[in-house]
Regions:
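Helix-loop-helix hairpin linking two adjacent transmembrane segments in secondary transporters
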Residues: 126-175
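C-terminal transmembrane helical hairpin of 12-TM major facilitator-type secondary transporters
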Residues: 241-245, 251, 259-308
């Protein structure tokens, strides 16, 4: 249920501008850049409101919060369809940003932590397996609707889907279970470091890896072209990222679930640097290898963002803590396409030295976090 609702949430909001930006800009008389700036502003607002949304899930449970996010999504999408200029465009994405703060992965992970406690790892992995197909499923739907009924009606259709499909699915979620005080975080889980220090470290890890993820999502074909690949070859190689993400998540679900999540996170954080080094050293012949390695690491890291804090700190206060730790990652998600575009324009594939360094830094932080031997 939650996996399907998350597929709808991601596909109708986060992945929507990639399909509708050109149609929106043409009719409103603004550049596509302004469409993506409005989208980024919505992401920034979701980062600001994320901790409050997480705290609300801690107190009320996802069964009450997630359906409200569907209402907000529906309102924002309806406003987007009614947009008549740049100001109404920004207003619509601000409303959608409110919905994203309480309706995407962080909220879903917090909901599962409230329902299953420390046993939520498999459920979190399952959610990412299903919702990992959001772009695969929703991009063709949005493109077809845009061509047949127009971008405004497409927004209305997605708004209706939130009311008729997403909200009923979220209303069927189980009630959260009481979280025992014994599930509170243990100082030993961080090898004597304070909880706030570990939280800050994880926040950096998630921000660094998400910067790499969103940079590649926005610019991967161009990166591969800079390495010497033709446009057709670059697009074909970039298409391997999605299957690699899903394949890695299946591997995590069946094999790596017996290991502590920090092991998965360490491996995942090294994937992008290894792939980047391979591409820089070998050039275009390594384009497919880079896409597969990067995609696999990105797929597992998405899971780690939900399971690692749960394993280290427990389910108590998970929503608020997750919102605080993920706020920087959401910020970088909104700004990284612009920053990496500057780096790529100036340095070509040399821009991968920067993202690769971020991955190595993330691994270093994860390597400094110690867990009790009995949970490793």
């Amino acid at each position: 249920m939650l996996g399907l609702a998350q597929t709808l949430a991601w596909g109708s909001t986060y992945y929507l501008p990639a399909i509708l930006a050109n149609s929106i800009s043409a009719e409103l008389g603004v550049s596509t850049a302004w469409v993506f700036v409005a989208f980024s502003v919505g992401l920034l607002l979701s980062a600001i409101l994320g901790p409050a949304a997480g705290r609300l899930i801690d107190l009320r449970g996802g069964r009450r919060v997630l359906p409200v996010s569907n209402l907000v999504f529906a309102a924002g999408l309806a406003l987007l369809g009614l947009s008549s200029g740049i100001y109404s465009l920004f207003g619509a994405w601000l409303v959608i940003g409110i919905g994203m703060s309480a309706g995407l992965y962080e909220a879903a992970f917090s909901t599962l932590a409230g329902i299953y406690g420390r046993e939520a790892r498999r459920s979190i992995t399952g959610i990412t397996l299903i919702a990992g197909f959001a772009s695969t499923v929703c991009w063709p739907i949005s493109a077809y609707l845009d061509v047949t009924i127009g971008w405004r009606a497409t927004c209305y259709a997605w708004a209706a889907a939130h009311l008729l499909i997403g909200m009923p699915l979220n209303l069927l979620l189980p009630r959260p279970r009481p979280v025992e005080k014994t599930e509170a975080p243990r100082a030993q889980a961080a090898a004597g470091r304070g909880r706030l220090v570990v939280m800050a470290g994880l926040s950096f890890v998630f921000a660094a890896t998400w910067f790499c993820s969103t940079s590649m999502a926005a610019h991967l074909p161009r990166v591969l072209q800079e390495s010497g690949a033709t446009l057709a070859a670059a697009v074909a190689a970039a298409a391997l990222v999605g299957p690699a993400q899903v394949g890695a998540r299946v591997l995590e679900f069946w094999l790596m679930r017996h290991l502590h999540p920090i092991v998965s996170a360490r491996v995942a954080s090294l994937a992008h640097p290894v792939g980047a080094a391979t591409l820089i050293a070998a050039g275009s012949p390594a384009a497919s290898a880079f896409a597969l390695i990067h995609g696999g690491g990105n797929g597992v890291m998405t899971i780690s963002m939900g399971t690692l804090p749960l394993a280290l700190f427990g389910a108590g206060g998970y929503g608020l803590r997750q919102g605080l730790m993920m706020a920087p990652a959401r910020f970088f998600s909104a700004t990284s396409p612009f920053v990496f575009d500057i780096l790529l324009s100036r340095f070509g594939t040399g821009a991968l030295f920067f993202t690769g360094a971020l991955g190595v830094a993330a691994f270093t932080v994860l390597a400094l976090i110690r867990v009790p031997a009995r949970t490793a």
